[in-house]
């Protein structure tokens, strides 16, 4: 759906005068910048002969008192607008108008230079013409009989605009004005035009007269939107003296003097390095200042890099204050260490741990005694292990659990057969009697041979209960009574030896027995206690 707009009906004096008045009030609203020497006036306004093209793309809601739709507008006509104002061409005049020289001229006479004609106005007239406007945009229109017309653009409708001014000969100024005016017109379509159309629509939708609509529109446009935010702030608890000091500080930054006046309790930026040095004085001065002590004569005039501990202060002060002085020194050193850099690490303190060597020694001993079977169980528990090889119980303590060291794997060999016991021989009487167990007559394999430990009264046994489990000395065989099944052909040599020993001991003394044994060992036939055995068969003479 499209419409043909009767554009010639807009060429009326009443509409033109009302539009000029409305735009003049809008352009001069708010605080005027110092670069402008006069107000902005509209010199020429012409709507042109070419009407814009208006097309409705969609109608969302249609009623007697309500309408909502999407439209498209295209304009490439001959509309033009000419503005007139005066521009301040003296930069020193602009600088003096922006400064606070008038408020502080009494205290600071030389804030800005006072050359001849330096602060006089130099106004240049400026004519600004806007023409060749090209618009192409899509917007949304919402019309209500009670609320008027509302229009919002979905995109930036401004395609191009031509800006002509008095300064077109200066290319830099021409480019600057072109960019600034394009940005302002885009803001006009985005914010100002919807508000303006809404106010105009109320003229036809309400019973109020035109003057009331214009007055309401003037009140809306006369609001100081671009006013300084500091003007709306309420200054509280600021005396006139403080305001004068603040103005003096502000003016000191604008002066052309080589010697900037110094102000009390104020740090200048060029003196900031000296101020930072005073923030970190030496240890002695900080100590005297914090504790309220009189300065020691030995440390007067010491440089700020000297941070040694004042031993003279500790020696001269009372013994009761020495502890407080040492605590203050520690706090000052900690603050200086932390303020040195953000990547600081906590200071290391000397600590002494007692009993660490003993605990480490116990852990090492337990690790040596552990086997690979104990190293598998890593849980916090107590384990006892007993074997035929050792009766040592291994207990995993809390210290071992916290710091576990894997021992070297040990090869465990378990003998399935218990070791042989030491052979115990019964000491008999030294004689070559065939009745003796050591005689050659019973030396062969058979009964009475000491190899089977039968003659000594000790039967062979493979039971592990008789082994020495505690590592003590082995028990002698004659102290252990073992019941041995006796054979019918067995000769009890021990009883015979006891009888022989008893017979010798009853009739003779120890010396006689010693002599007899000696004679017997030398084969003395005179003192032979009993008959000698016959010689072996290989020693007999052959007949």
From Swiss-Prot:
Annotated ranges, domain SMP-LTD: 1-202
InterPro entries named among the record's database cross-references: Mdm34, SMP_LBD
Keywords: Lipid transport, Lipid-binding, Membrane, Mitochondrion, Mitochondrion outer membrane, Transmembrane, Transmembrane beta strand, Transport
GO MF terms held by the record: lipid binding
Claim: Transport is one of the keywords in the record: yes
GO cellular component entries: ERMES complex
Membrane topology category: Multi-pass membrane protein
UniProt keyword annotation of Transmembrane present: yes
Disulfide bonds: none
Region (Disordered): 519-543
Protein localization: Mitochondrion outer membrane
Any one GO biological process: phospholipid transport
Free-text note regarding domains: Lacks alpha-helical transmembrane segments, suggesting that it resides in the membrane via beta-sheet conformations similar to those predicted for other outer membrane proteins and porin. The SMP-LTD domain is a barrel-like domain that can bind various types of glycerophospholipids in its interior and mediate their transfer between two adjacent bilayers.
Family that this chain belongs to: Belongs to the MDM34 family.
Function (record text): Component of the ERMES/MDM complex, which serves as a molecular tether to connect the endoplasmic reticulum (ER) and mitochondria. Components of this complex are involved in the control of mitochondrial shape and protein biogenesis, and function in nonvesicular lipid trafficking between the ER and mitochondria. MDM34 is required for the interaction of the ER-resident membrane protein MMM1 and the outer mitochondrial membrane-resident beta-barrel protein MDM10.
Subunit structure: Component of the ER-mitochondria encounter structure (ERMES) or MDM complex, composed of MMM1, MDM10, MDM12 and MDM34.
Protein name in the entry: Mitochondrial distribution and morphology protein 34
Record lineage: Eukaryota, Fungi, Dikarya, Ascomycota, Saccharomycotina
């Amino acid at each position: 759906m499209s419409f043909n707009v009767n554009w010639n009906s807009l060429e009326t004096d009443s509409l033109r005068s009302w539009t000029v008045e409305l735009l003049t009030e809008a352009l001069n609203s708010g605080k005027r910048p110092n670069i402008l020497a006069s107000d902005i006036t509209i010199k020429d306004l012409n709507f042109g002969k070419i009407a814009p093209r208006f097309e409705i793309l969609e109608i969302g809601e249609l009623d007697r008192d309500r309408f909502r739709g999407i439209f498209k507008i295209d304009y490439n006509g001959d509309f033009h607008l000419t503005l007139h104002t005066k521009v301040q061409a003296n930069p020193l005049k602009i600088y003096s108008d922006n400064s606070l020289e008038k408020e502080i001229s009494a205290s600071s006479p030389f804030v800005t230079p006072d050359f001849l004609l330096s602060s006089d106005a130099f106004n240049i007239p400026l004519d600004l013409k806007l023409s060749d406007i090209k618009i192409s945009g899509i917007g949304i229109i919402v019309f209500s009989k009670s609320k008027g017309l509302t229009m919002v653009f979905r995109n930036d409708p401004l395609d191009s605009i031509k800006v002509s001014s008095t300064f077109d000969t200066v290319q830099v100024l021409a480019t600057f004005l072109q960019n600034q005016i394009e940005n302002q017109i885009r803001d006009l379509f985005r914010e100002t035009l919807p508000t303006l159309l809404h106010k105009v629509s109320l003229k036809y939708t309400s019973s109020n007269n035109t003057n009331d609509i214009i007055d309401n529109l003037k009140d809306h446009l006369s609001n100081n939107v671009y006013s300084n935010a500091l003007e709306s702030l309420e200054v509280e608890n600021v005396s006139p003296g403080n305001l004068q000091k603040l103005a003096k500080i502000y003016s000191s930054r604008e002066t052309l003097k080589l010697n900037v006046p110094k102000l009390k309790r104020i740090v200048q930026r060029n003196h900031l390095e000296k101020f930072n040095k005073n923030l970190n004085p030496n240890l002695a001065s900080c100590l005297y200042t914090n504790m309220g002590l009189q300065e020691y004569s030995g440390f007067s005039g010491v440089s700020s890099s000297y941070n040694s501990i004042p031993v003279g202060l500790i020696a001269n002060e009372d013994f009761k204050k020495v502890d407080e002085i040492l605590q203050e020194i520690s706090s000052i050193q900690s603050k200086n260490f932390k303020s040195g850099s953000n990547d600081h690490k906590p200071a290391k303190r000397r600590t002494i741990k007692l009993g660490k060597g003993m605990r480490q020694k116990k852990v090492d001993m337990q690790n040596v005694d552990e086997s690979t079977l104990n190293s598998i169980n890593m849980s916090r528990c107590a384990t006892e292990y007993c074997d035929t090889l050792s009766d040592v119980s291994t207990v995993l303590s809390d210290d071992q659990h916290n710091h576990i060291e894997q021992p070297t794997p040990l090869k465990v060999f378990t003998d399935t057969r218990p070791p042989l016991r030491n052979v115990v021989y019964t000491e008999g009487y030294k004689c070559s009697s065939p009745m003796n167990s050591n005689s050659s007559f019973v030396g062969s394999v058979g009964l009475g041979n000491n190899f089977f430990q039968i003659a000594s009264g000790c039967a062979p046994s493979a039971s592990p209960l008789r082994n020495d489990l505690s590592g003590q000395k082995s028990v002698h065989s004659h102290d252990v009574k073992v019941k041995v099944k006796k054979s019918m052909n067995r000769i009890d040599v021990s009883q015979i030896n006891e009888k022989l020993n008893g017979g010798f001991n009853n009739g003779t003394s120890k010396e006689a027995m010693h002599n007899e044994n000696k004679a017997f060992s030398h084969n003395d036939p005179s003192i032979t206690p009993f008959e000698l055995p016959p010689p072996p068969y290989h020693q007999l003479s052959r007949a």
